[in-house]
Amino acid sequence: MIRHILVAVGTNPDNSVLKSAIDKARHTGARLTAVYVVDTMPWWAMAGVEYGCFDSIQMVAELERTVERRCKEVFELDAWDIHTQAVTVPLEGGSVGRRIARFADELDADMIVVGAGHGSKWRFWEERMSDVVARCTRRAVLVAATADARRDEPAGEEAHRHQQARASAPARAQTL
């Protein structure tokens, strides 16, 4: 039985993950907590401070307020009938995925909803945040696809021909 759902939100203005969590909370009757993990001293802000750009730290705080405000607006419009809250937590070392898993333990959440995300092409050694959350918790994890990750539009002609060729190919299994 799911009584409490934790949804991880970020700076992406697409609210599809948050709306998926709202639908799940409404379906199960659970309360919903949206969490934004904020790195209070990101490397890019510290690099800016070194060169006299002190607005970087203020920009981090403004970004935090913007995400929290966006969550509250979505809650007011789409989740007016369920118990919700939006919180921000500091990163406190480690990765964002590990912090979300720890926060789910602190709240005793029954399910964590995260976005599918995408792997970095430049930092190939880093895992997707959704993979880290799933590995670092024993709680149920729902990986929700964002709008840009969905494949609602029809595939191209070449992809369609390739799929037909794969489907019509005979299957051969080697037996020992």
Language model features: what each stretch is:
Residues 1-53, 136, 163-176:
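Small/aliphatic-rich secondary-structure junction motif
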Residues 111-135, 150-152:
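Glycine-rich, Arg-bearing micro-motifs that act as flexible, cationic patches
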Residues 38-41, 117-119, 146-149:
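Short beta-alpha junction loops
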Residues 52-69:
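A short acidic, glycine-rich active-site loop
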Residues 17-18, 44-47, 94-98, 124-125, ...:
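Short, well-ordered secondary-structure micro-motifs
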Residues 13, 75-112, 131, 148-151, ...:
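Structural beta-alpha unit
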Residues 7-9, 35-37, 87, 114-115, ...:
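Conserved beta-strand segments of the P-loop GTPase G domain that flank and frequently precede/overlap
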Residues 139-154:
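Short, flexible loop segments at boundaries between secondary-structure elements
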